[in-house]
């Protein structure tokens, strides 16, 4: 396998005021034909969201979406009627399959939320959507 080194300062970047985001792969307004995906890894975004702000309800289909809070509180809601707040030490996984709507917000009114969002292309499309969260401090290794 060929070794690829992508320096942090060469990533895509956008600052929308409420969202400061860094993209490892082409995403939203950032497009780099050399960085579409790495195998099944499609998205690796490093996001900082200001207090009380976030991503309004929007759809996903046929993607594994993983969110990892690094600092702060991430509030999740979805069309499967899940509603949860996760924090550092937790991991959220959505298998979006045939389709799911969800929102993600900074649950704090005073502190920034920092989190990673990772998308992985699934092996099988149009499966039943599933949401789960895990407390990695409780995982027996």
Whereabouts are the PLM-identified features?
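A short glycine-rich, His/Asp/Glu-containing loop-to-beta-strand
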Residues: 15-59, 63-64, 115, 121-122, ...
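Basic/polar N-terminal segments that are highly enriched at the extreme N-terminus
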Residues: 1-5
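Short beta-strand segments in beta-sandwich/barrel cores
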Residues: 48, 72-76, 91-92, 125
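Conserved, well-structured core segments that form or line functional sites
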Residues: 97-101, 109-141
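Short acidic-glycine-tyrosine-enriched beta hairpin
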Residues: 78-95, 139
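Short beta-strand His + acidic residue motifs that chelate non-heme Fe in jelly-roll/DSBH
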Residues: 76-79, 93-94, 101-109
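Generic beta-strand structural signal
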Residues: 64, 84, 90-92, 100-102, ...
């Amino acid at each position: 396998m060929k070794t690829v080194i992508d320096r942090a300062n060469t990533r895509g970047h956008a600052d929308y005021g409420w969202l400061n985001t860094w993209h490892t792969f082409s995403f939203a307004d950032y497009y780099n034909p050399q960085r579409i995906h790495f195998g099944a890894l499609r998205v690796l975004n490093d996001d900082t969201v200001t207090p009380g702000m976030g991503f309004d309800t929007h759809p996903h289909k046929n993607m594994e979406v993983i969110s990892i809070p690094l600092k702060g509180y991430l509030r999740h809601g979805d069309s499967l009627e899940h509603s949860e707040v996760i924090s550092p030490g937790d991991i959220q996984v959505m298998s979006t399959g045939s389709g799911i709507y969800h929102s993600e917000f900074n649950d704090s009114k005073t502190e920034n939320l920092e989190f990673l969002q990772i998308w992985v292309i699934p092996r099988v499309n149009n499966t039943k959507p599933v949401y789960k969260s895990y407390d990695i401090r409780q995982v027996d290794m």
